[in-house]
């Protein structure tokens, strides 16, 4: 509440008019510092303040991280791709909530494979290839923290991931990454696409075999009466 104040005579100091006590008014509630939960970080419901007097009226609560929910091997929450297949083109995107996108791949045979990306929208992307033993969600969580710090302060370090096996930022199409690597049969690898700085966007990725190791089958020899087959 409040008080209107007394009216005082400047000459004699007498109270000319008594003030009135005011009843407290209703707070104008505003919720601040809301944070959405994702597959990698917890959320926050936000603190409630009075937008008029700026008093905090209520504390918010932490909300748990989301679970990866897969449908056709794609997480419905974050877009993460599990069990990526050879010669299949996947379209995905990064956002401010999910600045890094994960593609899991298990090599069907020993051999050389290429992870080739194309930026569909105009942004500068980075690609990282991880061996299974060096990758977990904490890698992405650390990257998100760097990304958010860079968004808040342009002078902060670029949001580079740690622990990767190989990385690239230019050998795909439209400033997208492409990485070629010798992989082991039945080993799992993780290819991660993320921002060079703070720009996010849409991209496609295709994993192919480079056919560096070949052999010939079905060869037959020709003579004067019958043809042959090169195999």
For every predicted segment, state its role.
Residues 83-93:
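Predominantly extracellular/luminal regions of secreted and cell-surface proteins
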Residues 1-83, 211-231:
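Thrombospondin type-1
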Residues 34-36, 91, 185:
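Residue-level detector of functional hotspots within protein domains
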Residues 94-212, 223:
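Acidic, Ser/Thr/Pro-rich low-complexity intrinsically disordered segments
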